[in-house]
UniProtKB/Swiss-Prot annotation:
It is a single-pass type I membrane protein. Disulfide bonds: none annotated. The keyword Signal applies. This is Prostate androgen-regulated mucin-like protein 1 homolog. The modification Phosphoserine is found at S284. The gene is Parm1.
């Protein structure tokens, strides 16, 4: 029993400390973290339809903000009474970063936040009302981070457009100098050709110099074609007909036969028995090479 009493006293003192702790305004980073995820409100106030607008709609006009602020301030007493009944369990420690209970946004930390730049520009006194349970600062704070997020997007788009235009201008500037000297070149040539006929004479050898250069690749191609024997045979077949090829083969065979026939005849004539066919006398020495010759 004593332990239970001590635990109850500890819980009671902790609750008193939480309730009596001063509400310190949170920095901008905590404001964005606590207000950005909130998309809709689930209170029973008559202006819930106005509060259910998404966070992304950050492009509101000044007139819309003034009317919403005036309507919210006119409904502050009723909202304060309704939330006064349900607000005690919603109070929490300033240093805690835990989310509020389900169905209720964290309004205790957003109540003493400084007004956004949009509120200062509007100059409406309703924007500086201390909302200790009211919902107008939540709406304004939910609009502030979205406007802050849209401003970098616009700056990025402007920087991209500026870079694209600068690159386009640089390319145009690079193209124009190349085209500029080409344009006056033709009038000068026409002027020189009209006044001095020698310019034509100097311009004529240019194609003459190019003509041998054009023929040189043709020669190289012909030489490469002559190196292959298959192409040579094709050229020979195309140049000679079948009759000319037959005549060439016959002449080659006849020449071969004549050469071999003459060699055989000379060999037989100069053999050991060839001297008998001769009619002249060989002298006293006789023909000792012939076995039929009888010297006796």
């Amino acid at each position: 029993m004593v332990c239970k009493v001590l635990i109850a006293l500890c819980i009671f003192t902790a609750g008193l400390r939480v309730q009596g702790s001063p509400t310190v305004p949170l920095p901008v980073s905590l404001m964005t973290k606590s207000s950005a995820p909130v998309a809709t409100w689930t209170t029973s106030a008559p202006h819930t339809a106005r509060a259910t607008t998404p966070v992304a709609s950050a492009t509101h006009n000044a007139s819309v903000l003034r009317t919403t602020a005036a309507s919210l301030t006119s409904q502050l007493p009723t909202d304060h009474r309704e939330e006064a009944v349900t607000s005690p369990p919603l109070k929490r420690d300033v240093n805690s970063t835990d989310s509020s209970p389900a169905g209720f946004p964290s309004t205790s930390s957003d109540g003493h936040l400084a007004p956004t730049p949009e509120e200062h520009s509007l100059g409406s006194p309703e924007a500086t009302v201390p909302a200790t349970g009211s919902q107008s600062p939540m709406l304004l704070s939910s609009q502030a981070p979205t406007s802050a997020t849209t401003s970098p997007a616009t700056s990025l788009s402007e920087s991209l457009s500026a870079s694209v235009t600068s690159s386009h201008n640089s390319t145009v500037a690079n193209i124009q100098p190349t085209e500029a000297p080409m344009a006056p070149a033709s009038p000068t040539e026409e002027h020189s050709s009209s006044h001095t006929p020698t310019s034509h004479v100097t311009a004529e050898p240019v194609p003459k110099e190019k003509s041998p250069q054009d023929t040189e690749p043709g020669k190289v191609i012909c030489e490469s074609e002559t190196t292959t024997p298959f192409l040579i045979m094709q050229e020979v077949e195309n140049a000679l007909s079948s009759g000319s090829i037959a005549a060439i083969t016959v002449t080659v065979i006849a020449v071969v036969l004549l050469v071999f026939g003459g060699a055989a005849y000379l060999k037989i004539r100069h053999s050991s028995y060839g001297r008998l066919l001769d009619d002249h006398d060989y002298g006293s020495w006789g023909n000792y090479n012939n076995p039929l010759y009888d010297d006796s």
